[in-house]
């Protein structure tokens, strides 16, 4: 498999309603794909399957090289493997600053002890500033995230995902 992600024959049903039927596709590295459709078409269900939130009735989801099944992995293990997901409603820490939100999202060791003992260094601050500039929030790093507009919170969440350096970003 040369694809970053390969979905093959995936079907999902909820109480008899078929949300996905025999979905198959692949995504290569550095490839952009758009999934469009009306409400109820299965777009969110597809993302739920890839990120481990929903287990399919049948089919397979392979990730990386060598290919590994994502179906046996937890949501957190899938995220650590490099799959990032942006939800419809932004989820940011509203009592923390933009800078703090981005700093907490940096790709670092995630054990409880590592998180408690984390002390940002110069490269961490530089990466946060770079991310803030990319998402258009460089001028508001010191503002509390709860003070941002809805659109700015959306961008902040995208920045938080980018901080984790995902190999695949589902938006």
Region annotations inferred by a language model:
Residues 115-140:
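Conserved ABC ATPase "signature" region
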Residues 144-148:
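Conserved ABC ATPase signature
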Residues 169-171:
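Catalytic Walker B motif of ABC-type/P-loop ATPase nucleotide-binding domains
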Residues 36-38:
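The feature captures the beta-strand-to-loop junction immediately N-terminal to the Walker
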